[in-house]
Amino acid sequence: MNSYSIKELLNKQPVGDTAEINGWVKTFRSNRFIALNDGSTIHNLQCVVDFENFDDTLLKQISTGAALKISGTLVESKGRGQSVEIQAADVFVHGTADAETYPIQPKKHSLEFLREKAHLRVRTNTFSAVMRVRSALSFAIHSYFQQNGFYYMHAPIVTGSDAEGAGEMFRVTTLDTKNPPLNDTGEVDYTHDFFGKETNLTVSGQLEAETYAMGLGKVYTFGPTFRAENSNTSRHLAEFWMIEPEMAFYDLDANMDLSEDFIKWTLQYVL
């Protein structure tokens, strides 16, 4: 018996073949129709369970959120919404989910609600789509710069530099914040700290990238960046990923051409 991802089954549609799939239950209707999703695609695969052939104790373990392994035959679907479905011959429960308390039910949830369920929200269509786009964008970013002769560099996350100089930074310290050592002027004595000086989470990899560009010509950074401005707006984030290319011998026109070409290329790739 072949083990497939749901994406493979929906693309190949090997009708008549026996298949084994694993995934999480999105819905279980009429004690008969299971909509299963394994994360390989945003689309679900319908699995038909003839409840007369299965023990009632097993069926009671199947609810939204449960993890299952289903084996059966891929057949043409007689219903609407899908072209093929699995006629289940065997169902194994990897793990159950309490139907009364499992939070991600088959309905629309607000973003505020999902923010409180961060460990499960990727199972919703909204967040699974967002993560697929982010994954494709990340790959596109690296592909673009690699194809255009850039070198990828890892800028430090913990740093003593303030590349921007105009914003608040998250401090990083191993000192006892309740009883820090003080110098002669009554200020915190960071010479006793891990690095012997003040350190913070990076606000930009610009300075490090500029030094690398002076030896490699064209480099870019792409990684997490942190800002400690306490501004609760859609344009302020405490943590985000920033792209910073640095090129030696580029003038303003070349910089603008690169920016325009980069945006066009990455968007076309994702779309």
Task: Cite the ranges covered by each PLM segment.
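Class II aminoacyl-tRNA synthetase catalytic cores and aaRS-like
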Residues: 1-271
